[in-house]
Protein backbone atom coordinates (compact mmCIF):
# COMPACT_ATOMS: atom_id res chain seq x y z
CA UNK A 1 0.00 0.00 0.00
CA UNK A 2 2.89 2.32 0.70
CA UNK A 3 3.97 2.07 -2.97
CA UNK A 4 0.60 3.38 -4.11
CA UNK A 5 0.82 6.33 -1.74
CA UNK A 6 4.29 7.16 -3.02
CA UNK A 7 3.05 7.02 -6.62
CA UNK A 8 0.37 9.66 -6.08
CA UNK A 9 2.77 12.44 -5.00
CA UNK A 10 5.09 11.48 -7.84
CA UNK A 11 2.25 12.15 -10.28
CA UNK A 12 1.82 15.72 -9.13
CA UNK A 13 5.49 16.49 -8.58
CA UNK A 14 6.67 14.98 -11.86
CA UNK A 15 3.66 16.28 -13.77
CA UNK A 16 4.26 19.83 -12.58
CA UNK A 17 8.04 19.65 -12.78
CA UNK A 18 8.43 18.03 -16.21
CA UNK A 19 5.42 17.24 -18.43
CA UNK A 20 2.32 15.12 -18.62
CA UNK A 21 3.55 13.00 -21.54
CA UNK A 22 6.93 12.05 -20.06
CA UNK A 23 5.52 11.42 -16.61
CA UNK A 24 2.49 9.53 -17.86
CA UNK A 25 4.50 7.19 -20.06
CA UNK A 26 7.01 6.55 -17.26
CA UNK A 27 4.30 6.00 -14.66
CA UNK A 28 2.28 3.84 -17.01
CA UNK A 29 5.28 1.58 -17.59
CA UNK A 30 5.83 1.27 -13.85
CA UNK A 31 2.17 0.60 -13.11
CA UNK A 32 1.85 -1.69 -16.11
CA UNK A 33 -0.73 0.43 -17.93
CA UNK A 34 1.44 0.63 -21.03
CA UNK A 35 -1.28 -1.13 -23.02
CA UNK A 36 -3.90 1.34 -21.82
CA UNK A 37 -1.65 4.34 -22.45
CA UNK A 38 -1.18 3.24 -26.06
CA UNK A 39 -4.91 3.30 -26.76
CA UNK A 40 -5.61 6.85 -25.53
CA UNK A 41 -2.45 8.06 -27.22
CA UNK A 42 -3.74 6.86 -30.60
CA UNK A 43 -7.04 8.68 -30.06
CA UNK A 44 -5.24 11.77 -28.78
CA UNK A 45 -5.32 14.80 -31.09
CA UNK A 46 -1.52 14.84 -31.05
CA UNK A 47 -1.41 11.41 -32.64
CA UNK A 48 -3.82 12.54 -35.34
CA UNK A 49 -1.62 15.50 -36.20
CA UNK A 50 1.51 13.42 -36.54
CA UNK A 51 0.22 11.06 -39.23
CA UNK A 52 -1.53 13.97 -40.96
CA UNK A 53 1.70 15.89 -41.52
CA UNK A 54 3.67 13.03 -43.10
CA UNK A 55 0.67 12.10 -45.24
CA UNK A 56 0.39 15.61 -46.63
CA UNK A 57 4.02 15.78 -47.68
CA UNK A 58 3.97 12.67 -49.89
CA UNK A 59 0.65 13.85 -51.33
CA UNK A 60 2.13 17.09 -52.68
CA UNK A 61 4.87 15.47 -54.80
CA UNK A 62 2.39 12.88 -56.06
CA UNK A 63 -0.07 15.56 -57.10
CA UNK A 64 2.61 17.46 -58.97
CA UNK A 65 3.59 14.38 -60.95
CA UNK A 66 -0.04 13.71 -61.93
CA UNK A 67 -1.14 17.17 -63.08
CA UNK A 68 2.26 17.86 -64.68
CA UNK A 69 1.47 15.27 -67.35
CA UNK A 70 -2.17 16.33 -67.68
CA UNK A 71 -1.43 20.06 -67.84
CA UNK A 72 0.50 19.90 -71.14
CA UNK A 73 -2.09 17.50 -72.62
CA UNK A 74 -5.01 19.70 -71.62
CA UNK A 75 -3.30 22.86 -72.85
CA UNK A 76 -2.53 21.31 -76.24
CA UNK A 77 -6.11 20.05 -76.76
CA UNK A 78 -7.90 23.45 -76.65
Curated annotation (Swiss-Prot):
Expressed in chondrosarcoma, melanoma, cartilage and testis, but not in other normal tissues. Residues 35-78 are annotated as: Disordered. Its main location: cytoplasm. One of its GO terms (biological process) is centrosome cycle. It comes from the Eukaryota. Keywords: Cytoplasm, Cytoskeleton, Signal. The keyword Metal-binding does not apply. It is found in: Cytoplasm, Cytoskeleton, Microtubule organizing center, Centrosome; Cytoplasm, Cytoskeleton, Spindle pole. Residues 1-19 form the signal peptide. GO terms for cellular component: centrosome; cytoplasm; spindle pole. Transmembrane segments: none annotated. May play an important role in maintaining centrosome integrity during mitosis. This is Chondrosarcoma-associated gene 1 protein. It comes from Homo sapiens. The gene is CSAG1.
